[in-house]
């Protein structure tokens, strides 16, 4: 068990994927997932353990999967997709002996993901098919998918691509990612009525056709050192515009990810590191 109901203690593992950090809880014994207040308390970097998201390991939901996982943002809200988290869950399952093959399946809140164990502590995860249709993102006010959308925001016009990778993303191409107004524009887009479920906002700079730089302002978290689904979103939006090749390196503040999308009718595959930091016990 991860939770000791008699004492209030909670055992956990701290992990990160390219700097996107997680508190991982083993709930396969049926222990209830954290409520919003507990998730926010655990994620607090001053009064809790500290992380971007909480990951809960649970019993599998689909045939053939070895386990499932839930995702909780640092503000206590539930999330539906987390690419860096998927790699960390995969590594945790391998370390615990639950996943014993080089290839296996895990269930996220939105779908089943095929995972491949690579060399050097890296994992590849099939992230599903990108959805560009506005109702699927969801993006209100647009009937058909476009390469670029424009929204008036506080007197300015913000131009962006939009896609769902199991969660909504807006992708803003910039000349210099270091100078991008990440928090200001990210917050304005998240609060815009065009995104009824809010949105993760990526700011991407094309270095060359095989390399981009990216910063992501995540809903429920803020700017993170890395965002796996955000890296997928930025890559596929640029691929649709023929700005980059179908196999691209994404440099984020916390590390490097590789995104491959062989063709429009195949799944996006993300690969990158999964790192164990420490195991601990939270006393509540």
Swiss-Prot record:
<dbReference type="GO" id="GO:0009089">
    <property type="term" value="P:lysine biosynthetic process via diaminopimelate"/>
</dbReference>
<feature type="active site" description="Proton acceptor">
    <location>
        <position position="227"/>
    </location>
</feature>
<dbReference type="InterPro" id="IPR001653">
    <property type="entry name" value="DAP_epimerase_DapF"/>
</dbReference>
<feature type="binding site">
    <location>
        <begin position="218"/>
        <end position="219"/>
    </location>
    <ligand>
        <name>substrate</name>
    </ligand>
</feature>
<dbReference type="GO" id="GO:0008837">
    <property type="term" value="F:diaminopimelate epimerase activity"/>
</dbReference>
<feature type="binding site">
    <location>
        <position position="167"/>
    </location>
    <ligand>
        <name>substrate</name>
    </ligand>
</feature>
<keyword id="KW-0963">Cytoplasm</keyword>
<comment type="function">
    <text>Catalyzes the stereoinversion of LL-2,6-diaminopimelate (L,L-DAP) to meso-diaminopimelate (meso-DAP), a precursor of L-lysine and an essential component of the bacterial peptidoglycan.</text>
</comment>
<feature type="binding site">
    <location>
        <begin position="228"/>
        <end position="229"/>
    </location>
    <ligand>
        <name>substrate</name>
    </ligand>
</feature>
<dbReference type="Pfam" id="PF01678">
    <property type="entry name" value="DAP_epimerase"/>
</dbReference>
<protein>
    <recommendedName>
        <fullName>Diaminopimelate epimerase</fullName>
        <ecNumber>5.1.1.7</ecNumber>
    </recommendedName>
</protein>
<feature type="binding site">
    <location>
        <position position="20"/>
    </location>
    <ligand>
        <name>substrate</name>
    </ligand>
</feature>
<feature type="site" description="Important for dimerization">
    <location>
        <position position="278"/>
    </location>
</feature>
<feature type="binding site">
    <location>
        <position position="53"/>
    </location>
    <ligand>
        <name>substrate</name>
    </ligand>
</feature>
<feature type="binding site">
    <location>
        <position position="73"/>
    </location>
    <ligand>
        <name>substrate</name>
    </ligand>
</feature>
<dbReference type="GO" id="GO:0005829">
    <property type="term" value="C:cytosol"/>
</dbReference>
<keyword id="KW-0413">Isomerase</keyword>
<feature type="active site" description="Proton donor">
    <location>
        <position position="82"/>
    </location>
</feature>
<comment type="pathway">
    <text>Amino-acid biosynthesis; L-lysine biosynthesis via DAP pathway; DL-2,6-diaminopimelate from LL-2,6-diaminopimelate: step 1/1.</text>
</comment>
<dbReference type="InterPro" id="IPR018510">
    <property type="entry name" value="DAP_epimerase_AS"/>
</dbReference>
<feature type="binding site">
    <location>
        <position position="200"/>
    </location>
    <ligand>
        <name>substrate</name>
    </ligand>
</feature>
<comment type="subunit">
    <text>Homodimer.</text>
</comment>
<feature type="site" description="Could be important to modulate the pK values of the two catalytic cysteine residues">
    <location>
        <position position="169"/>
    </location>
</feature>
<keyword id="KW-0028">Amino-acid biosynthesis</keyword>
<comment type="similarity">
    <text>Belongs to the diaminopimelate epimerase family.</text>
</comment>
<keyword id="KW-0457">Lysine biosynthesis</keyword>
<feature type="site" description="Could be important to modulate the pK values of the two catalytic cysteine residues">
    <location>
        <position position="218"/>
    </location>
</feature>
<feature type="binding site">
    <location>
        <begin position="83"/>
        <end position="84"/>
    </location>
    <ligand>
        <name>substrate</name>
    </ligand>
</feature>
């Amino acid at each position: 068990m991860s939770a000791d109901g008699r004492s209030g203690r909670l055992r956990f593992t701290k992990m990160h994927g390219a700097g996107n950090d997680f508190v991982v809880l083993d709930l396969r014994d049926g222990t209830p997932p954290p409520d919003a207040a507990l998730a926010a308390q655990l994620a607090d970097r001053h009064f809790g353990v500290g992380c971007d998201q909480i990951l809960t390991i649970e019993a599998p939901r689909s045939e053939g999967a070895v386990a499932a996982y839930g995702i909780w943002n640092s503000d206590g809200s539930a999330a539906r997709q987390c690419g860096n988290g998927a790699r960390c869950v995969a590594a945790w399952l391998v370390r615990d002996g639950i996943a014993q093959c080089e290839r296996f399946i895990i269930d996220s809140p939105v779908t089943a993901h095929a995972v491949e164990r690579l060399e050097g502590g890296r994992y590849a995860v099939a992230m599903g098919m990108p959805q560009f249709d506005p109702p699927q993102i969801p993006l209100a006010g647009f009937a058909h998918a476009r390469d670029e959308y424009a929204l008036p925001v506080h007197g300015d016009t913000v131009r962006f691509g939009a896609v769902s990778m199991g969660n909504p993303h807006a992708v803003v191409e910039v000349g210099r990612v270091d100078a991008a107004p990440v928090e200001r524009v990210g917050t304005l887009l998240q609060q815009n009525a065009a995104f009824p479920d809010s949105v993760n906002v990526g700011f991407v700079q094309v270095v060359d056709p095989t390399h981009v730089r990216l910063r992501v302002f995540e809903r429920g978290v803020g700017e993170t050192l890395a965002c796996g689904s955000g890296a997928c979103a930025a890559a596929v939006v640029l691929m649709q515009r023929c700005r980059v090749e179908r196999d691209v390196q994404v440099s984020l503040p916390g590390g490097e990810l590789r995104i491959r999308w062989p063709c429009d009718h195949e799944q996006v595959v993300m690969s990158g590191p999964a790192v164990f930091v420490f195991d601990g016990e939270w006393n509540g």
